[in-house]
């Protein structure tokens, strides 16, 4: 089949998204609804599922009104990893739509969607090292080709995005707090508080952030009355520490693989300080750094539709449609 046109559905966590993407990289329709879980101080799975049930039909209806779905090649949906209830909603609605249109439906690995999102806007070649950093995942992957990935390392506890949100909660900010931490860090002194950069003296590409979380709790409770200056300095110190960990593990990954290209993917990859730190690392090591802009960093359906197009073109369509909350490479 040529000139693929795919409708993608993304419901792995707390974003409800639908997109229609062409093989040429044109995003014909794209809508993302971000749920409000602030009163829970984190993603509440049951609420997420109910919101997907309510919102997804509305977005699909708008997609139908905006585009002739008879022209679609197929439907694609995230099958994992993610929250099981949220995944079930997306998979069942994608299957129902595909049945009504008499179109095939394909499952997509959410992490592969993040990894390939950059190729929707920039035709970079394989192989490359991909650092996926989001609220639920932190991994280093040797990407050798479509469907050919090797996990080099991952977090042993908290994901980077999760750590940002937990710090925000400790400081009294609403969930999600990653952007608040980033904004405050701009005004802070990154050298005021020394935080443990766990595992940077160990070989391999695994991360650990639990020690940083414990250290942050001690710092915050030791301050008699925390000021805005204290908060800014804590955020800046934390951000500098996690960026240092990323650089260290990325350097080890590049040495293992020997690739000259790096891809930064996932929502935390939109953090300006982290991007600038990794850009400096890449420049100093004669490497090229690539990342998608804007909403393509976050959970979105355009990356799911694009991953399906890439897999169709490569002849890799074997992924099961069963929701797989712990799906890995």
From Swiss-Prot:
One Gene Ontology biological process: tRNA threonylcarbamoyladenosine modification
Cofactor mode of binding and number, as noted: Binds 1 Fe(2+) ion per subunit.
GO cellular component: cytoplasm
Subcellular location: Cytoplasm
CDD domains hit by this protein: ASKHA_NBD_TsaD_bac
Essential cofactor(s): Fe(2+)
GO molecular function, one term: N(6)-L-threonylcarbamoyladenine synthase activity
Cystine residue pairs: none
Positions bound to substrate: 132-136, 165, 178, 271
Keyword Iron-sulfur on entry: no
Binding locations of Fe cation: 110, 114, 299
EC identifiers of the protein: 2.3.1.234
Keyword Zinc-finger (UniProt): no
Catalytically driven reaction(s): L-threonylcarbamoyladenylate + adenosine(37) in tRNA = N(6)-L-threonylcarbamoyladenosine(37) in tRNA + AMP + H(+)
Major subcellular site: cytoplasm
Protein name stated in the entry: tRNA N6-adenosine threonylcarbamoyltransferase
């Amino acid at each position: 089949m040529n000139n693929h046109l795919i409708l993608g559905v993304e419901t792995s966590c707390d974003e409800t998204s639908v997109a229609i993407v062409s093989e040429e990289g044109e995003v014909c329709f794209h809508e993302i609804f971000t749920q409000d879980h602030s009163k829970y101080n984190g993603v509440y799975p049951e609420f997420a599922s109910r919101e997907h049930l309510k919102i997804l039909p509305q977005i699909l209806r708008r997609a139908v009104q905006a585009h002739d779905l008879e022209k679609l090649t197929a439907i694609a949906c995230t099958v994992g990893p993610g929250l099981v209830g949220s995944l079930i909603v997306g998979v069942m609605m994608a299957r129902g739509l595909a049945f009504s249109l008499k179109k095939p439906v394909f499952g997509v690995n959410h992490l592969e969607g993040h990894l390939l999102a950059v190729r929707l806007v920039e035709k970079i070649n394989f192989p490359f090292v991909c650092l996926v950093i989001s609220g639920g995942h932190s991994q280093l992957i040797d990407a050798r080709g479509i469907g050919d990935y090797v996990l080099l390392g991952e977090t042993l506890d908290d994901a980077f995005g999760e750590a940002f949100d937990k710090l925000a909660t400790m400081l009294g900010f609403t969930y999600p707090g990653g952007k608040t931490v980033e904004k405050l860090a701009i005004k802070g002194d990154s050298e005021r508080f020394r935080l443990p950069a766990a595992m940077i003296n160990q070989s391999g590409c695994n991360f650990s952030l639990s020690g940083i979380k414990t250290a942050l709790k001690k710092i915050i409770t030791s301050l008699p009355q925390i000021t805005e200056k204290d908060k800014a300095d804590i955020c800046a110190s934390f951000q500098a520490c996690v960026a240092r960990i990323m650089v260290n593990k990325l350097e080890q990954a590049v040495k293992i693989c020997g690739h000259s290209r790096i891809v930064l993917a996932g929502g935390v990859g939109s953090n300006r300080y982290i991007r600038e730190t990794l850009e400096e690392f890449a420049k100093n090591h004669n490497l090229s750094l690539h990342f998608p802009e804007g909403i393509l960093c976050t959970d979105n359906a355009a990356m799911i539709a694009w991953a399906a197009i890439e897999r169709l073109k490569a002849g890799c369509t074997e992924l099961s449609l069963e929701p797989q909350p712990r799906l890995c490479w």
